[in-house]
Amino acid sequence: MTDKFAEFLKIASQLNKMGIVPLLMGSLGLEQVTGQDWQARDIDIHVHGDERGWEAPDEERIYDMDKIEPMMDRLGYRFVDLHEHEFQKEDLSIEFGAMETLEAFSGVSIAELTRKEVEGVEFLVPTADQFLAIYRASSQDS
């Protein structure tokens, strides 16, 4: 288990205690699906949020931010960017996104994501094919 994945599990465990099952995205999520090291530089976590995504005001985009921010603070992270909903601890960056934007953005339905449990921690992760659809949409969005 990589250090970043262990850190994700620590955060996801706290989210689970708040009734939140997070979606692990980005390179770290892809590592869990493929078993390959994609050299994740950060941790991308999606939770429930406004389906308007970037169109929604920063303060309203991520639901339960009023609970997530103090939880991250207790874990030693500092809130550094409201627009990206980014937290940092030393050289590690955690960014929160809204999972409700996924289907409109990439065609991937939240209902079709894979639910996993590792060390008693529940989280969602896309399949390899879903990651491909997400990365294709990202490349066209840039």
Residue ranges and their predicted role:
Residues 1-142:
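Compositionally biased terminal segments of proteins
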